[in-house]
Amino acid sequence: MTKTLPEDFIFGGATAAYQAEGATNTDGKGRVAWDTYLEENYWYTAEPASDFYNRYPVDLELSEKFGVNGIRISIAWSRIFPNGYGEVNPKGVEYYHKLFAECHKRHVEPFVTLHHFDTPEVLHKDGDFLNRKTIDYFVDYAEYCFKEFPEVKYWTTFNEIGPIGDGQYLVGKFPPGIKYDFEKVFQSHHNMMVAHARAVKLFKDGGYQGEIGVVHALPTKYPFDPSNPEDVRAAELEDIIHNKFILDATYLGKYSRETMEGVQHILSVNGGKLNITDEDYAILDAAKDLNDFLGINYYMSDWMRGYDGESEITHNATGDKGGSKYQLKGVGQREFDVDVPRTDWDWMIYPQGLYDQIMRVVKDYPNYHKIYITENGLGYKDEFIESEKTVHDDARIDYVRQHLNVIADAIKDGANVKGYFIWSLMDVFSWSNGYEKRYGLFYVDFETQERYPKKSAYWYKELAETKEIK
């Protein structure tokens, strides 16, 4: 039977400033840590990415034409404040006013993120969010944006606090490239959650119009053998690192006893301690019921085994299937040999994990209010067919269809899910894979910056029109 989605459902497309805009040093934009990190370590940079800085009218016209009625956009903090604080860059401000006006002209609702992996370099060098001064600067920047852009009705503080701590201090594939430092991982998570809570409280106290929330990446963690206590414990600990610690801070305003026991165990094995103040708990508590929505980014699930050894992670950046290794001291190891399809980058395709994660939020955090699936999609080595000027991306259509089906199931089972944003609207630059890995509804020829709708774009258009998942 064909499943349907609600009449008022948002069928969106997602982007991010650094991955889409290009123009990394145009019109007074300040540097971000990624600029230097890519120059020093990789064979690609985010210049010109998808040239969204100049081509946004084209992408928004395509959005309107293909039934995309919501877009995730992030403001580049360093376009507004090149150093993260102090002097405002008027050209950056003007750009976002023009961009939001174009969104409204095309009837595409902008869902605007304040921070999407791109702390200004000046602040990043000084410890990023491990330095509590960055919290203050972020809140000042947030307040400036709330005042300056009343045309925005949906705000998100951060995109993926979990993967920021994970990428910067655990896997080491984000600048500053530190590995296996659990103290920094949890402190980064916590400090960013304090910054989130302060910004949300300020938004509500200031009486700004619209809604505010946060976007969390929530990969579901399962024990490889549910009857093996070591595997069960490994899944619980891995879930605390990636999901529970951050969800507790968001909706409980504190960390549950089980969460803190898990954190203390991980830190006792690996070294380090957390610095959490009474004021931190007070602000987390003050904000816990003020989030209007939760954005869930979901791509994959993981299966965990018990593990008694040192930490070792090998990140698959090449798309050669089978190149991943992930084992953490005192936590567990990911088992890749499971009967689940996976992408060329070893991401486990498991739609049931999205259903389970949504229902977990509904059950454990009943004050969640509503959910948007803010990212979900398939990274693929798309083959452009020159004669047809398109891509036959049936695998992407199938991936999205499967995930929308479980979203429909979750709604039927009582979850308040209000929209879905495919990652990504058009092909964009990928943080650790450059330009090889494509996700978009619209194919971007990065040489000419021309856009070509893929087969998935036509499928998505029909979906948005009929609300039927075919």
From Swiss-Prot:
Organism domain of life: Bacteria
Signal peptide: none
Biological pathway: Carbohydrate metabolism; lactose degradation; D-galactose 6-phosphate and beta-D-glucose from lactose 6-phosphate: step 1/1
InterPro entries: 6P-beta-galactosidase (IPR005928), Glyco_hydro_1 (IPR001360), Glyco_hydro_1_AS (IPR018120), Glyco_hydro_1_N_CS (IPR033132), Glycoside_hydrolase_SF (IPR017853)
GO molecular function: 6-phospho-beta-galactosidase activity; beta-glucosidase activity
EC number: 3.2.1.85
Active site (UniProt): E160 (proton donor), E375 (nucleophile)
Residues noted as binding D-galactose 6-phosphate in the record, renumbered to the chain: Q19, H116, N159, E160, N297, S430, W431, K437, Y439
Keyword Ribosomal protein belongs to the record: no
Entry keyword Hydrolase: yes
Gene Ontology BP, a term: lactose catabolic process via tagatose-6-phosphate
Catalytic activity: a 6-phospho-beta-D-galactoside + H2O = D-galactose 6-phosphate + an alcohol
A single Gene Ontology CC term: cytosol
UniProtKB keywords: Glycosidase, Hydrolase
Family matches, as HAMAP family: LacG (MF_01574)
NCBIfam families with a match to the protein in the record: lacG, PRK13511.1
PANTHER family to which the protein is assigned, alphabetical: GLYCOSYL HYDROLASE, LP05116P
Family, similarity comment: Belongs to the glycosyl hydrolase 1 family.
Record protein name field: 6-phospho-beta-galactosidase
